[in-house]
Structures are given as structure tokens and as C-alpha cells.
Amino acid sequence: MASGPGAATLKKCLEVLRDARNDSEQLAALLLVTKAVRAGDLDSKTRRQIFDAIGFTFPNRLLSSRQAPPGCPEHTFRALGLTLLACFCTEPELAGHSQVLNKIPTFADVLLSPCQPDCTSMVDDAYQCLAAVLATPRGPREMVTKGAASALCQAYVNGGYGSERALALLLGLLAVSEAKCWQRDAPHLLAVLSKLSEEFVRAEDGSQFELCELLPRFIPLSPPLAEVSQGSECVRQLYKGLASILGSKLSQSQRDPALKLAASLTQACGSEWIPAGSTGSKFLALLVNLACVEVRLTLEEPEPLEVEGKKEVVTACYVLIEMGIQECLKEEESLLDEAQRMQLMRIMEEAFGAVVFYLRQVKEEELQDPFVFASVRILGAWMAEETSSLKQEICELLPFLVRYARKLFKEGGPAENLPQTAGLVSSDSSILGQDALRFLLPGFCHLTAEDRPRDILISEGAPALLCDYFLHQWGVLTSQPGSLTSTEMSLQTLCGIFLNLVVTAPNLIRQEKTFSSLMDTLLKSLPFLLPQKDHLVLAANIATLGLVMARILSSSAVLQKTGSAKEFFRATICFLSQAHTAQADPGSHGLALAVSPAYVSAWDDIRELWFLGMQALASCVPLFPWLPQAVLQAQWLEELSELLTRVTAASVDFELIAAFQGVLVGLARASKPCREVILSHHGEEWANLYGMAALEQCLSKQ
């Protein structure tokens, strides 16, 4: 408790409060208590004594009162009630009490009311209460739902007394409840961003670098910033300010926050925040160049990340470099010309050399560091697109990448639907549950097509890991309703990797037990997936992979007359047989062969898979005696005969004719009933018409 005369006075006041017989006596004692509270610092025990003597009831009545003692300002009672609550709120236990949380609208109202010179203490008390509430477990959520977030925004934009405290509280609230704040109060937050953006463009005294630190908190990832007019204007202002800053000579402490702000804009808007034209293209090239230089200068040091805050800066640079990769690969509407692309690719290659160098130094105890994850993630983005550079360095790093991905997958389990970009990570956040494999898969798909990296991946046990990962991702897709784009893309890429392995390392498929488990999952998954038309690309991948694996694993137990095997082949027949149809030919009065309407939108993605699937099905026919019967039951031969009879021969290209002939010959040789169906539907005639010599020969034999 405070010492000296103040302590004695406070003690007497507390006695009066406890013994008060009416409101007048209690109010008189409260006024003395308030004076004592303001006069000096109180310890926790004293504050608790005040609360025990007063409770919440009387302050609540003071806050709701619209009267005042004769000769006093009308807000006297409210000011007294706020002072008491501000005193109580210094105790965390009381700050989180429902009686305080219920007063959040009152605190917000004080911030938005016109502040007279004699009201500043009320505003101070309201801010003190809100700051205390923010520090409690329930506080941030209650502040959002009860209107404190919007009030803080308005208080800052209005620029009245205490507006800087409003901004500080907003920053704290966004740090813990960003998504909820934007979901509920986007217009008010955009108003704050608008004010900050205008200040940013005008600032010339060094404060623009302080604003670079603040602004990322007010840049939302969703909804997209550029979709609303107010947001678009903010983006324009921020670009203008950053272009001015980054075009000047900067110290390290000035450049770092500018790069982080640019990365935040990139995460929110991609490259769309940078205007088209030569000015924008030069700025983008400068930005990516600066990011690459920063990565090299930092990661090539012996102790690269000892400096405080360096990880956040380099991670921001990763976001900018990823934007550079995407712009260099754009075929249309790229901000960069060809010369700029070539230059940036060379500069980025040097930066990724530094990333590889850093990752090779990572120790076992550092594997949980989020910065390692960010570095692996951005390297995965490079490996997905650039397959010719740093090949030797990547090969040497592959054992680490496989080990790292396995550790995260086995220990944490993959986290679904992480943002695709490299991401700004906090140095103290956990990577438990983050999914490194997802970002490495496209690169692995390229590498499994090449001998040396494929051999390294196999020797490090990557195929078994990838099989386990496929089974897990399939479980995620089937257990969570709705569209899981990233999960589906991962499954498609995994199918591409396995197709590479089937073609180049068939013995591996026979010997690795996990591929039998994978085969079993493929057999069961296609019948489930195919009826869902929005998953056609994944279904095509699974159908084709299952067929080519079935050729290798035909003698395995999982494929021997099992119900799931027959269901799978029925589904593949359905997928392959429904890809083409007859439609009116604009160039003639006849019909032309065309891709079926249900397949048109996906055909570019599944065309090669369809042809490979037809080839694999033909190879499977002699291996599975019951397969021709499945084709007969599906009536595919009748439908194909009718299709080839109806359309003009000129509309069927040679590659398609070869695909049909391969399956038809296989069926005619393996099954007398199939041969008879083809013959009974004028097979010899259209075989001759389409130049299917092998089929003609097969049909002519008795």
C-alpha cells in the first residue's frame, strides 16, 4: 500500500466505504479514494482491497448515470466510474472479469465522444481499461465482437486526444485476432490503412521507415486488397512511397522494413500492386534484385542469422523472389521483358545457391526453426520451375531435403491449405505440423525423370515416404468435404512422380512393399472419385497410374480377382470410353469426332494421361482374363463401333486411331466374344476405313 499520509487516508476511506449507509456516504468516500488512487502508485494488495470494498455494482451505476452533483460537469459520475475500473483493470484477474468485458462498448463510446479539455482523464482511463482487456485470454475476441476494434480505428482516423494509443492498441489486437478484425471491421481498418498510406507518401523526415514497420499489420490477405476502390488507392500510394524509398540510397536499417512492406503487399496482391509499363518493370526488377542481394549477403556469412530480425527480413525477400520466379515464367502479361527475365533468372540462381549453401549447414537441433522451413519452401518453388541450374548442388542437398520432409511429416503430420507463397514467419513460431513435402513435390517430379537425382531419392527412401504421404493426403481429401485444391494438386503431382518411377524403375515398384498399399488405395479410390466430375484431372491421374502399376503388379494378391480390382477396371473403362463423342462438323454436313463436353475443360491436363491409359489398358488385357468380360459388360465395343461408323474418317487423327486400335487388337486376341462383337458391328469395314491394319489382320483370322 502507498506509504505516508496517503496510506492513512486511503485506509480511512476504505473503512467508510465498507460502513457506508447510503449513496451519499459511499460517493464521498469514493471521491477520496479516487484522489488517493490518482495521487500515488498502489500495490496489488491495495487495489484488491479497494475492489473488495466497492465491487462492480456501484461503478456500474456511476457509468450509467446521466446526472451530476450540483455545480459539477455532467460526466463527473462516469469519470469516477471509469477511474475505478481502470484501477481494477491493473489486476489481470479483474481485467478479464465479465463485468469489465461487458463495459467494452462503454469504453469505445468514450473514445468516440468529443473530448473536452476536462475529459482527457476519461479517455486515458478508457484506453487503460482496453489495454488491460487486450492482455486477457478472452479480451481480444470480446473487443472485436463488442465494437472496440472499429472504435479504435475511428479514434485513430479522427486524430483526437489519445489517437496514437488507439493505433498501438489496434496493432496489438491485429497481432492476435487479424482474421476476425478484418472479417468484421474491414471498412474501418481500410480507413486506417488509407490514413497511414497518405502519411507514408508525404513523410520526409525518416518517419516513412517507422511506417514501413507498422503498415504490414494493416494489409489484409483476405479479402484481396485491390478488389475495393479504397484498397486500390492505398496500394497505389504504398507503391509510390516504396518506389521513392527503394530508388534512394539506403542504410541496412532503412532497407529492411521497406523490403518487409513490399513482401506484405506481394502476399496480399501478388505482382498486381506494381503498375504495368517500363516504370513498373524496372521497379519489380529492382525489388527482386535487392531481395536476391540480401539473401546472398546474409546466407553466405559464416553465422548468417545471428543478427536480431534477420530471419524476418530474409523470409520477406523469399516472398519477393517467388514473385520474381512467377513473373519470369508468365507467358502473357508479364511485367518483365525478355532481357529482364534472363538477368533476373541469373541473379535468382545466385541467391538460390546461397539458400542451398545455408541449408547444407543446418544442424539437427535447428530443424524445428521456421526459417529452415521457409528456406526449404522457397527452394521448392525454384526446383518446381528451374530444372537445369544448380543441378549438382541440388543433388548434394537431396538427402537433407528427404530427411527434413520425413521428419516434419512423421512427427507433425502435414498441415493442409497453407498459403502457397513463401510466407512471412515469426522467428519464435512453431513449424510443428507444417508440410514441407507439399512444396518439394513438383521439384521431385522433375528430378525423378533424371537418372542421378532419381537414384539419390531412391537410396534415401523417398519412394516409401511419398507412398505414405499419398495415403495420408488421400485420407485428407476423402474426410474433409469441399474443395481442397492444394491437397488435390499434391495427389496429382505424386501420381506424376510414381509414373516416372514406373517407367524408369519398375523393379522398385515390385520390391517396395509400400507400392502394394498404394495399389490397393488406387483400386478403391477411382470408383469413389470418378462420379465427382470436379475431380476429373485427379481421376485421370489415378486411373492411368493404376493401370501402369497393374501391369507390373499383376501377380500380386491385391489384383487377383478381388472385388476392388474389378471395380477399378470398370471405372477405368468408364473414364477412357467416355472421353470422345460425335458432334456436328461446321466444315461439312457430317459428324466429327470430338472431346466430350464433360472432358473439354480438363482435356489439356489429361490428354497425355488418356493416351497412356489406353496403352496401359491394352497391355493389361492379356494379364487379367476377366478384363474382356468387364469391357463387354460396359458395352464399350458397341459404342466405339457406332462412334467410328458415324463420324467422318478425316476427323479422327492418327494418334487417336492408334490408341483405339491398340485396345481393340488386345481385346480381339484375348477374347472370342469381344472379337465377335467387333465383327458384328462392321468392324472389318471401319478398320479398313481408318487404316487399322493390325485390327484387320486380327479380325480376318478364323
Swiss-Prot record:
Gene Ontology BP terms: neuron projection development; regulation of neuronal synaptic plasticity
Highest taxon in the source lineage: Eukaryota
InterPro entries documented for this protein: Neurochondrin
Assigned keywords, A-Z: Cell projection, Cytoplasm, Synapse
GO CC annotation: cytosol; dendrite; neuronal cell body; postsynapse
Main location: cytoplasm
Location(s), subcellular: Cytoplasm, Cytosol; Cell projection, Dendrite; Postsynapse
Classification via PANTHER family: NEUROCHONDRIN
Chain's role: Probably involved in signal transduction, in the nervous system. Required for the spatial learning process. May also be involved in neurite outgrowth.
Family label: Belongs to the neurochondrin family.
Protein name, UniProt field: Neurochondrin
Organism: Gallus gallus (Chicken)
Gene: NCDN
